[in-house]
């Protein structure tokens, strides 16, 4: 691991943290790809450790600290922001995101329903349909380059989420 500290005079009341690891979505199979891509949304909706997203907001009341996971094709990352007095809280959130991610079936089901509703609306938009065709033709029906669809969302498997997150 490599730690870089860079003090600046830009914002004296803010501390930023960035953690980046190699791998990202490239470590996942084609079948796992879209579940991996949705992982930051799942994390945001589910909370961490023993805290649901709602409980976590209550615990962080009065504090300025957050950590948000993200994933790209070749990297996984976590970004954090806090006030100087809340550095310990931000580091605790980082630790929980690494060691105790939370996966709540109800939250994942809600995310799935939301995506399906958005896709149903998008199917009536000619721009969406055109973009879908352009993407298919441009990338030769590559499973990692197709636009998300109801078929893909319906294949989401809650039981696979912890294993995908660990990769």
Task: Give the residues covered by each predicted segment.
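Short structured motifs
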Residues: 4, 63-64, 160-162
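Residues embedded in well-ordered secondary-structure elements
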Residues: 6-8, 67, 166
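Non-catalytic, conformational "gating/processing" segments within enzyme and secreted inhibitor domains
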Residues: 132, 158-167
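Short, intrinsically disordered, charge-balanced linker/junction segments flanking boundaries
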Residues: 1, 31, 165-167
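N- or domain-start disorder-to-order transition segments that initiate the globular core
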Residues: 1-12
